[in-house]
């Protein structure tokens, strides 16, 4: 399925990517694997592997709205900007949210992208 928009809900343990167009919705979940070692007791390595998997899953999606808690957003944004700068132009925005359902996320994203596309002068594909 070719989609133009996606919304990512991320926290430190999991991520959900909802790709959508006017008629279709496709969901993908990514979970963090926690494997603390004596050498990497802080879990930074695990977090980086998790964020890398999320960035890989976002590859090829033209516009993504990233949602989540403020700390989850800040940490993912820092990782993406530092380690995956090619992804930055595809991230349309960051929106803090609590724990919305998938339909609530899609509704939020549709509203966001309608505003975003109009401001950018980009026609939204139908």
Predicted feature locations:
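Terminal alpha-helical anchor/extension segments at protein ends
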Residues: 1-126
